[in-house]
Amino acid sequence: LTDMPVIGPGMSHTCYQSPIDQPLFEKFAAQGARFLNRHDEPVYSPTYGVSYVYAYDPEGNLLEMEKLDGEQLLKHAGYLDNWDKDNKPIWMSQVSLFTPDRDRLMQFYHNIFQTNPHRIVEVPVGEFGDNLFDIDNAKVQIGWFRLNRQSKVMEILQFLNPPTPQSMIEREPTSLGYSFSLEVSDIEAEYQRLKALGIEFFSPPVKLGRFVQAYARDIDGNIFSLRQPVDSDGPFSVKAYDKRGGL
C-alpha cells in the first residue's frame, strides 16, 4: 500500500469536523493517522475560524480534519441542530474529488445534481496552502456543491501548482481506496435519467443488504453509486442521519 498523492487525481479524501474543544486530531493520531501538514501542526485560518489538518490513515488513504471555532460555524455545519443533540461530537462533512479539470468535472456533477455550485474559489500561493499541503507555492482552485440543505457538500479541487495529473488507472468498484454513494428516493428513475445523460453503469440497480445500489464511473473515472434504502425511515437512511430533511 502507498500513500495517496496529495495533488490527486481521484477521490482524494473525506473530511471530518468537530467543535474546537474536541480532541479530533488526537483521536485520529491515536489510531495511527500521520499528519501531512508542514511541521506536523494544524493550520489555522482566522478568516474562516477553522483549524485544518490533512493526514494519512494506516493504509495511506488521505483524510482531512477540521476544528470549527464559533457558534455560527457549528450552526452552519449542522452541529447544533443535529450532532450535538445526539452526543456525536465528530461528523463527516464532505467528499473531495481532485481533478486535472475542475470546470469539466463540475459541469458533469451539475448535470447529475441539476443544481449550481454554491461556491467557487481560487486559493492563491501563500503560507497557508504551503503549510496545509506541505508543498511550496501550492495553488488550487475549488468548487463546492451542496448535497443537502446545509451540512453535506461535494468538493471538487484542481491543483494548478503543481498540476493535478490525469488518472492512468481504470478503477473498479472493488478497487482499493475511496468511492462514494448518492442516496436517492427513486433509484430506478435516477438510473434511467443518468443513463440518458450518457453515464455508463456497471449494472442495473441491485439489492445489497439494506440498500438498492447501482455503481458507475464519472468522467474522471471516479467510482460512485446511486443508492436507495430498502426502508426509507430506517436507521441507515440519510433521513435518519440528517433531521433537516436529507439530500
Regions found by a protein language model. Give the residues of each.
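Short, basic/aromatic recognition patches
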Residues: L36-Y44, I199-P205
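Short beta->alpha transition motifs characteristic of CBS
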Residues: M65-Q72, L160, L226-D233
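Short, flexible helix-coil linker/hinge segments at the edges of structured domains or between repeats
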Residues: R38-P46, D69-D86, V123-F128
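Vicinal oxygen chelate
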Residues: L1-F28, V50-Y56, W91-P100, G143-L160, ...
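Surface-exposed beta-loop interaction hotspot
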Residues: Y56-D57, L68-Q107
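Short amphipathic alpha-helices in soluble, non-transmembrane regions
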Residues: E26-G32, H110-I112, Q192-G198
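Core segments of cupin and vicinal oxygen chelate
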Residues: P46, L97-S151, A196, D233, ...
